[in-house]
């Protein structure tokens, strides 16, 4: 079997596997599927360097489904900014305007979980998802022994933390899987994530998962320090790691980091760094967020594990923008439970800087524990068999002449197959138009048969375009066509994300959608640059893209019926620009009051400070009302609030 035939069989096996396990609509008999898997295993045993990461023999998709209901978080689950050394930590602290009183704790390498409690009872559990909406895994959460199902606190509260698998338990799980001839988990993080997303809750239960809280989302707590919040949460019955402390200054933070780094191998669970957070909640509220991160906390990452291997070749990848990226082909090396066979070389200027050659021994790390990269070349170990890595002159895909601008080498052929295919794959991906069933292999198959050649051509596909293609039967074709039709009515921000504009990701796309609606591509440089979290680089990228693609976006609007979320804010009322805190029991849910305040241009905070303008209180208002009176903040009941919003 040749490589091309092997990859075609991988695609077919995945098609059959998804149909059987995810859609419950078999496209082949059990005997045919088993025979195909045996063919793949024979090839892979003989060609270990050619194994596709997409092969069904390399993953456990049949037991990990994506068929969970979606559940919205009451408050967004943010990512964290990463810092990797002392200078970056000090730069972060300077931006955070904080030089003292930091809360620190280990950053466990697991799966984030959001728990919702109401009236003291656990009512739901959800994965992080996209930060705003996660997967409803409540049934599995109830199988995690150390998560309290009832707590003494009766107000509604979201408690967030990390689900981990202990290293010893991870080894036992893999030993059991090996005995069952099942593929092994690469690391405890993947095992924890997979264990949470089981359709069979008994599997989750037997995995012995542990939950460590690290924060809260929606809450009505009245503390002034994050450390007080966490102490309260742990007193409700949650686990506390023994390395949690307050640091008076950055020097103490650095000392704690060094201590924790020494404990890295001794800890029973995987860690990839230390969380550093401003402890003062009022300052946290003042600092706020970028479009992606809270400004008041950072992940001080550990140095990635580093190993030596040999560079045996260089592959050239053509991105959807045409940029040529050299990728080092490595002799396989295990880094922190992950077998690494390739590493980024970024660009040819980086190759020159490293003075790296084919057959060199190199040091490779997983930068940020995610992307493998080469950091050092051991020139003293050269044996005379090394070969220079030449700058390419022709595109490896279409053979057209490349534009060499130094750092950037680019294929300018807009019809280059790799550019088009990668653009289409991105366009239909989960975070973009999310066309179910139109994955990477299917896109490549359709492009190969000239059924799709542009982004727009996706919406012109017909039933007869699929007839005769391997693996497609009537029901499968109709399902895919229905998914394409549904994608015509996707959210505007998904469409903006799908266009692949440089520097504009999902978060920025949502900001554009909310700020400008359907007119997002008709704005000025100043309008873009003035958006919160944007800057000159993003604004320039948007201006250039919209200038070139203005007419094309108009044409897309004729093909699509985009859902547009527009946040209408009244800017001439007495509430505009005012900060509210809501406490006590009101006649309607707090979310309704919050939505009204925000619509009128106000802001709702979770804690009372000198910057609070109004406290809206109801029955059984607690310490927030008392604190507001101490600070002489204006306190109004529901009747006074109703009069205020009429003005």
From Swiss-Prot:
- Which terms are listed as keywords in the entry? DNA damage, DNA repair, DNA replication, Ligase, Magnesium, Manganese, Metal-binding, NAD, Zinc
Q: Which residues bind NAD(+)?
A: 30-34, 79-80, 105, 128, 162, 301
Cited InterPro entries: BRCT_dom (IPR001357), BRCT_dom_sf (IPR036420), DNA_ligase (IPR001679), DNA_ligase_AS (IPR018239), DNA_ligase_CS (IPR033136), DNAligase_adenylation (IPR013839), DNAligase_N (IPR013840), NA-bd_OB-fold (IPR012340)
**Which intervals hold domain BRCT?**
570-647
Enzyme Commission number, as recorded: 6.5.1.2
One GO cellular component term of this record is:
cytosol
Binding locations of Zn(2+)? 395, 398, 411, 416
Listed GO molecular functions?
A: DNA ligase (NAD+) activity; metal ion binding
| Superkingdom of source | Bacteria
Q: What biological function has been recorded for the protein in this entry? A: DNA ligase that catalyzes the formation of phosphodiester linkages between 5'-phosphoryl and 3'-hydroxyl groups in double-stranded DNA using NAD as a coenzyme and as the energy source for the reaction. It is essential for DNA replication and repair of damaged DNA.
Q: Which family does it belong to?
A: Belongs to the NAD-dependent DNA ligase family. LigA subfamily.
Spell out the protein name for this chain: DNA ligase
> Coding gene?
ligA
